[in-house]
Swiss-Prot record:
InterPro entries: Ribosomal_uL3, Ribosomal_uL3_bac/org-type, Ribosomal_uL3_CS, Transl_B-barrel_sf. Residues 123-147 are annotated as: Disordered. GO terms for molecular function: rRNA binding; structural constituent of ribosome. This is Large ribosomal subunit protein uL3. The keyword Transcription does not apply. One of the primary rRNA binding proteins, it binds directly near the 3'-end of the 23S rRNA, where it nucleates assembly of the 50S subunit. The gene is rplC. Keywords: Ribonucleoprotein, Ribosomal protein, RNA-binding, rRNA-binding. It comes from Streptococcus uberis (strain ATCC BAA-854 / 0140J). One of its GO terms (cellular component) is cytosolic large ribosomal subunit. Belongs to the universal ribosomal protein uL3 family. Part of the 50S ribosomal subunit. Forms a cluster with proteins L14 and L19. Pfam families: Ribosomal_L3. Transmembrane segments: none annotated.
Amino acid sequence: MTKGILGKKVGMTQIFTESGEFIPVTVIEATPNVVLQVKTVETDGYEAVQVGFDDKREVLSNKPAKGHVAKANTAPKRFIREFKNIEGLEVGSEITVESFSAGDVVDVTGTSKGKGFQGVIKRHGQSRGPMAHGSRYHRRPGSMGPVAPNRVFKNKHLAGRMGGNRVTIQNLEIVQVIPEKNVILIKGNVPGAKKSLITIKSAVKAAK
């Protein structure tokens, strides 16, 4: 069965295992997620569980949003997302970090840091040209393609907005779960800036 939870990225730190191994970890704070709606094939055409995370002031919510969360007897939520293949949950129930345990393999989704307008070297990893000896080609994108089509093909590596994309890193290991602090420690780094929304769910391609 799939497990999933929403949280916020706190930052990175490092821990030592009992064997003395040094592990860099990302700290994810995941306060209890509230189930707002259970979608079924009969009512919605597909099966999913809609959860809400991070309370917000009622004055910031409109009347339909307040009525939607009132069915779960909870406060309006800042983030609302859906998880599929999750069973055994009812409207108003909570998903906590205790649903995960150390050693679980998960997929983590976040929004990568925005870098603004960048050139092809930083954005696509393109090699630069010679910097001396009369060269007039340094950090430019290079050839636009052959003459015959009379146009530039799609997906040509050019300068542009970099970052700010939805990124998923697969098969990350949960090192430790701290229920009293609503914290999950994940091995390695995860996409996103501090305080950004992070989605954690069971790995799709985990080794059987």
